Amino acid sequence: MIVTIINKVRKMAKGFLPFYLFTLLPLLSSCSDYSDYNTVPSAGDQPSANKTLWENISSDQQLTKFTALANKCNFAAVLQSPRFFTVWAPVDNAVSDAEYNRLMASDSATILKQFMQQHMTEYNYPVSSALDSMTIVSLNAKHHPFTSASFDGFSYNAVNIPSTNGVMHKISGLSEFHNNLYENIDDLSGCDSIKNYIQKYDEYYLDVNASVIGPLRDGKQTYLDSVMKKRNNVIRTIMRADLEDEDSTFCMFIPNDKAWNGAYAAISPCYNYIPKLDYMDLSLKTSVASSTKATDAKAAKAAEADGELQDSLTRRNIVSNLVFSNCYQRNWPLFGKGSFAANDTAYTTSRNSLTDLQEMMNHTIATNEMSNGMTRTIDSLDYRSWQTYNPVIATAYPEKALKVTKLTSHSIPLDSLKGRDSLFAHVPKMFMQWLKPATSRFFQYVAVDSANIDGTTGKPEFNFALRNVRSTTYHIYVVTVPAQVEEPLADVKPYYLRFYLSWTDAANKQQYTVLPQGAKSTIEMTTDEGESTATMTYIGNPGCVNVFDLGEFTFPVCYYGLDAYPSLMMMHTKSYTSSSNRKKYDQQMRVAGVYLVPKDYNDIWANNE
C-alpha cells in the first residue's frame, strides 16, 4: 500500500517521539488493557488527587524550575492531558543554577529530551515498601534504576502524589542526561573526520508504529501525525553495532582528526586501484607455465574500479573495528574492568579479533559516559595491519590444474599425526596456526597424480588465483606435503618445482615473473640450512612438510573486490620418461596452501624466530 504523509513531516534527529505527538493525546482515551497501570493508590482526601499533573506541578513552590522549563518547551498541555504518566520531579535545589540556565537557553527540543522526557514515563509506578529494584524506561528511551528508596540514585522528597492523570514523586537530584553512542556522533568536537563520514550515511524513515494513523484516501494510507526516525548504514552494516540501542553496552574508540589522518595515510596505499585492470583468466589458460607468455589467456574484459573506491575502502577500514560489546568478557578491560595482558584478544562488533588493544588505550585522551556505554577519544589509531585492512591471503585449492589425471582433497585427522613431529620439523611457527588450527580437527591438502604413467612427458601443474590481493608487499610461501603424511611407509622423495607469477603493473601492462625474482635458472638448490642463493628451482626436504619461501613481491595495484586477480603457477620441472627421474623425485604434488603474508607481519615472525 502506498503511504502518503499529508501533514508536514517533522524529522527527529535522535529518533524519539516528538513532543508534538503528545498534543494529540487528549483526543485519545487511555487503553483499558492497562487499567492496572492507570490507577494510583488510594489518595484519601489529598487535594492533589482532583488536579492534573500540570496543576499540581505548577502550584508547587518546590518545583518552580520544573514549571519554567515545562513552559519553555510548551509541555504544559501534555501534563494537562488525560494520558497517564509517572513523573519524577527534581525539586528546585536539586537543579543547579548553571544547569538551569543552560537548559533555559536551549531550544525546546533539547529541554524536552534532556529534562522533561528524562524524568517521565507512561503508566503508574508508585513507590511502596514492597517495590524491588526495577528499570524504568523514560519517555526519551533512557534507562533508570527505580527502587523504594530512590530514582536514578536520588532519594525522594515526597512520593505517590496523586493526580487525575498520573502520579508524581519529588526527588532530591537531577537525573543526568547522556547521549547514546549514536546520538553522540552529532555532538563530537575535534573529530570532524569520523563525524562527517558517519553523518554522510544518515537516513530518515517513517516509523509507522509511532505515527498516528489517519484515514484511507483514494486507497492510500494517510497519517495525522508522522514520526520520522534516523538510522545509519555505516553503523549497521560496517560497524555492525546498534549504537542507538539503550539495552546494550558498548565501548567505542573515537579517533580525533590527527588519529584519523594517520590511519588514512597508513591504509590508503593498500587500495591503489587503476581504472581498468587486465589480467590472466586461468579458465582460458592452456599452455604450461614454462611456455606461458605475459599476455596469454588475457581476460575478455578488463576489471574496472570506480575512482572513489580507494577512498571509500580506506574510510571503511578505519571505522570497522572501533566498537566493542560488553557482552564478551575479553573486552572488559576497555570498560575499566582489569587490564590487557600481552597478546590478549578483544572482539569487535564487526566480528574481528584484535590484539594489542592496550596500545590503543594508551592513546586515550578523553573518556565519556554514554547512556549505553562509553567512548574513548584517541589521538592515534595504529591498527595491526594484518588483523584489519591488510590480512594474510591464503588459498588452498587451485583454480586450474594442467597435465593432471586426478585431483583430490585430503583431510587427515590431527590425532593421527600425534607423535610425528618430524614431519613438521622444517615448518616455521607462523604457519602452524594455519596448518593445524585450534578450530579444526584435520590437516588438509590437495594432491594431483599424473606422473605415475610410464613414459609420460606431462609436467603436472597447479594454477592458483590469488584473490583480493592489496597493493602492498607480501612474502609469498607455498606449503607442500610429503606422501608420508598419509602413508608413513611410502618412499621418501623430494619435490622438484618451479614457480611463476602473473601480475599487472600500474600502467595496466601484464607481466610474467619467475619466483623468486632475479632467480638464476642454471642453479638448483635445496632448502637445507645455510643455502641462500636465489634460484629458479626448488627441491624440498624429502619426507617433510616444506614451506617454500618465494621471496618478497610488491604488487603495484589493488585487486580487492574485483574479478581480476594475479596468478601463481606451480609445476614439476622434470618429465618422467626417465625411470631415474621417477625413482629420484616425488611423482605427485601435494599442497597445503599458498600464503601471501604482509611484510610487516612476516618481519615480526622472522624477528621472533
Question: Predicted regions span which residues?
Answer:
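Bacterial Sec-dependent N-terminal signal peptides
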Residues: 1-53
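Mature, structured domains of secreted/extracytosolic soluble proteins
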Residues: 31-609
